[in-house]
């Protein structure tokens, strides 16, 4: 993870934008849609609490739109998502929840949902993580959420948890999604992999070659 973090820094993007884009790659691989939205959950601690010991729910949501182009190099997509996140932060008071409400005001989009969630706790104390972690009982009580990919760093190691609705995904598919995420992530120990197109990334032989080089 330390090597991957170094490469992320070299590209000039944040760890959160990188990891949520990896999720987009996985979803695109298993989906017939090349355009979709991920509901990004982040910690948004108000400035007046930054240096305090106050523990509370400071979560914020942002709807990230992805348009996956098969011949597009990954680093180009990554830079675009990074810029999109920066621009969205300028409107952080208008949260993803409020955007969803506005979308549903359209009669044709009344049932619109954004069921794929990415929860980033990077940079958050472990004691605070429980406030932004969507537990299994939360998923069972929130039918509009099908998946929550949660990431955090503990003792310099990246922890990834896929919280999936049991009635929405087969066990085989759930395992495949988690495995794809892990395999794709590990490929980025090689800085050159950021230059791969999405089509090349979805090539299992290409991925296996990179992973084999990593293990050598």
Named regions from a protein language model:
Residues 1-13, 104, 201-208:
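Flexible, P/S/T/G-rich "lid" or insertion loops adjacent to the active sites of thioester-utilizing
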Residues 2, 60, 64, 158-160:
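Short amphipathic alpha-helical segments
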Residues 7-20, 30-136, 166-170, 194:
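His-Asp-centered acyl/peptidyl-transfer active-site segments
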Residues 8, 27, 188:
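Hydrophobic pocket-lining residues that define ligand/cofactor binding sites across diverse proteins
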Residues 34-41, 69-78, 96, 139-202:
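Extended, hydrophobic beta-loop-alpha segments that form or line the acyl/peptidyl-thioester binding
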Residues 182, 201-216:
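N-lobe entry segment of adenylate-forming
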